Amino acid sequence: MGKSLIQQRRGKGSPTFRSPSHRFRGAVKYIPLNYTQDKTLRGVVEEIMHDPGRTAPVARVRFENGMEKLIIAPEGLLVGQEIYIGPDAPIAIGNTLPLAKIPEGTYVYNIEGIPGDGGKYVRAGGTYALVVSREKDKVIVQLPSGELKAFNPNCRATIGVVAGGGRLEKPLVKAGKAYYKYKARNRFWPTPRGVKMNAVNHPFGGKEHHPGKPTTTSRRAPPGRKVGHIAARRTGRRK
């Protein structure tokens, strides 16, 4: 009898394939909208920390109403710096305002998709979006991919560029560095190819390092055989 495929083991959800969220700093969300809809809150940056769960550092901020929140740190943020969140916050790095209040040409990040959802877009290290234009019922923002997306004017965003940029410029060079990179998030690495496995481990294993059978597979194949081009309409080069 053959052994379980990697995707079968992953689907079972053993600790090998689970993200170690107990090591992460916590959720990064804006203060609920009802606290800042009509007034602006002042906060002080107490600490800037590394977060194994994301590519950007996070900052712990204590606000004047006693709430303590984690925010994604922008480039240039300092411990002890005052930041503001609300409709009347000044246009400065680290401050959070509705998109309707942010001028065109401003770099922003951590943009809400729906007013009050806490921030969904542009959160990775070194990324930023650009406010392109403002209209009565929408604000056009250019995302890091180059896509122009329309947002509700009441969606909040933070001014600045996410810290942690340039992390991909230094090459890994050796496998040991990659090992620790993936270990931080418990990624299953390295991932062997099926044709390099023994026949007991994979339908394409054994033989002479080639599948030995068609790689197209039925959509209704059982889990241990469902590998390769699943329900493919066609394979190979277009002619």
Curated annotation (Swiss-Prot):
Residues 203-239 are annotated as: Disordered. Gene3D superfamilies: 2.30.30.30, Nucleic acid-binding proteins, Ribosomal protein L2, domain 3. It comes from the Archaea. Keywords: Ribonucleoprotein, Ribosomal protein, RNA-binding, rRNA-binding. One of its GO terms (biological process) is cytoplasmic translation. SMART domains: Ribosomal_L2, Ribosomal_L2_C. One of its GO terms (cellular component) is cytosolic large ribosomal subunit. GO terms for molecular function: rRNA binding; structural constituent of ribosome. The keyword RNA-binding applies. Residues 222-239 have a biased composition (Basic residues). The keyword rRNA-binding applies. Belongs to the universal ribosomal protein uL2 family. One of the primary rRNA binding proteins. Required for association of the 30S and 50S subunits to form the 70S ribosome, for tRNA binding and peptide bond formation. It has been suggested to have peptidyltransferase activity; this is somewhat controversial. Makes several contacts with the 16S rRNA in the 70S ribosome. Part of the 50S ribosomal subunit. Forms a bridge to the 30S subunit in the 70S ribosome. This is Large ribosomal subunit protein uL2. It comes from Pyrococcus abyssi (strain GE5 / Orsay).
